[in-house]
From Swiss-Prot:
Biased composition (Polar residues): 238-248
Protein name: Protein GrpE
Main location: cytoplasm
Function: Participates actively in the response to hyperosmotic and heat shock by preventing the aggregation of stress-denatured proteins, in association with DnaK and GrpE. It is the nucleotide exchange factor for DnaK and may function as a thermosensor. Unfolded proteins bind initially to DnaJ; upon interaction with the DnaJ-bound protein, DnaK hydrolyzes its bound ATP, resulting in the formation of a stable complex. GrpE releases ADP from DnaK; ATP binding to DnaK triggers the release of the substrate protein, thus completing the reaction cycle.
Provenance organism: Nostoc sp. (strain PCC 7120 / SAG 25.82 / UTEX 2576)
Top-level taxon of origin: Bacteria
Length: 248
């Protein structure tokens, strides 16, 4: 009996302690709940609704609708397309200008090159023309002077050697002599200073070259002075006219 009373007392004590613990927890829980609610009010952000009443289109994170984004992209694409078209037009214009400038420069280069060649040729021509009379004198001396003695032959050979050097130098510069004998008279190449009546050659044939002409390259450096064939006059009518008074 004594043991049973002890167990009953022990159980009642445990129940009493449990009741006290529950009361203590109940007395403390309202304050903790209030503190937790206030903390939630301070720290938790206000949630943004994902759907707007009256609008069935969902919004993106930045607040723009998909339709607005598509319209903005379309406008940006149209602007970029216009810029590309404008740049292409400018590129075509610049390309055309470049080609025109390049063509003008090429024409200028060719023109200046041609002018330079013409100037060089003119300077060369004027210089050689001053030397041709010396060549003429050498040729006259060779045709007219006939050395008789050994000393004269030595002198003849010496100046003929100078003449040969001069002619060789002119050849290297592109000078070549004309050979008009037997050809038809050409006013672009020849200068007629004499006419000789003859029936052995057609009229206008070059019979003799009196002063040698020269080419410089494919151009005339100096015209040849020539003697040209002319038709021979018929003297029979004149003789008949002279004899007719005597017969009368």
């Amino acid at each position: 009996m004594i043991d049973e009373n002890k167990q009953v007392n022990h159980t009642s004590q445990q129940l009493g302690e449990s009741t006290e613990v529950k009361q203590a927890i109940m007395s403390e829980s309202p304050a903790q709940i209030n503190n937790n609610e206030s903390a939630n009010e301070v720290t938790e952000p206000v949630a943004i609704p994902t759907n707007v009443v009256g609008d069935t289109t969902a919004t993106e994170d930045n607040g723009f609708t998909a339709t607005q984004i598509q319209e903005a992209n379309t406008a940006a694409l149209a602007e970029l397309t216009q810029q590309i078209s404008s740049l292409k037009t400018q590129l075509d214009e610049r390309s055309t200008q470049y080609m025109r400038i390049a063509a003008d420069f090429e024409n200028y280069r060719k023109r200046t090159q041609k002018e330079k060649e013409e100037l060089d040729l003119q300077v060369k021509r004027n210089t050689i023309l001053e030397l041709l009379p010396i060549v003429d004198n050498f040729e006259r001396a060779r045709s007219h002077l006939k050395p008789q003695t050994e000393s004269e032959m030595t002198i003849h050979k010496s100046y003929q050697g100078v003449y040969k050097q001069l002619v060789d130098s002119l050849k290297r510069l592109g000078v070549s002599p004309m050979r008009p004998e037997g050809q038809e008279f050409d006013p672009n190449l020849h200068e007629a200073v004499m006419r000789e009546p003859t029936d052995e050659h057609p009229e206008g044939t070059v019979l003799e070259e009196l002063v040698r002409g020269y080419y410089l390259g494919d151009r005339v450096l100096r015209h040849s002075m020539v003697k040209v064939a002319a038709p021979k006059e018929d003297t029979l009518p004149a003789q008949e006219n002279q004899s007719s008074p005597a017969d009368s």
